[in-house]
Amino acid sequence: MSVAGLSGARAATAAPTLSGEVILTLSGQVGTPETGATTAFDLGMLDSLPQREIVTATPWHEGTPRFSGPTIDSVLEAAQARGAMLIIRALNDYASDMPVEDARTIPVILATRIDGKVISVRDKGPIFVIYPFDQQPELFNEVYFTRSVWQVTAIEVMG
């Protein structure tokens, strides 16, 4: 299994090639059979994808921080992901399942910044899954809190 930046036909239009430190790896049902089953992203590649901002209260922050980053859906598209379930893993090996349907129907983001600043590992970075809790109050519950993984480093796409 090879690790590469974006592969296939979308690589030229979706994001630049890998040039910095890998902060996110997608594995499983990604890419094409010819390119392998792992796609790596650095911060620049994630920044090149369509960005979204969510201002929302969370159980883990004071006030209503402004989170920004690419939607999970755009990351899945860039990695040519196909599947129904995501296993999102953190630095400490915590993992949570997220239905791909969440990414397709809710503007969930892989936040790389809080209030315009890159999220450090100490502040729950490099990537934090953020749901639009204030915009969709029905999401403010334990089901979605467990899917809001912080210190994300890997996503496995399952069938």
Predicted features along the sequence, with ranges:
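N-terminal export signals
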Residues: 1-11
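N-terminal intrinsically disordered, low-complexity segments enriched in P/E/S/T
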Residues: 10-159
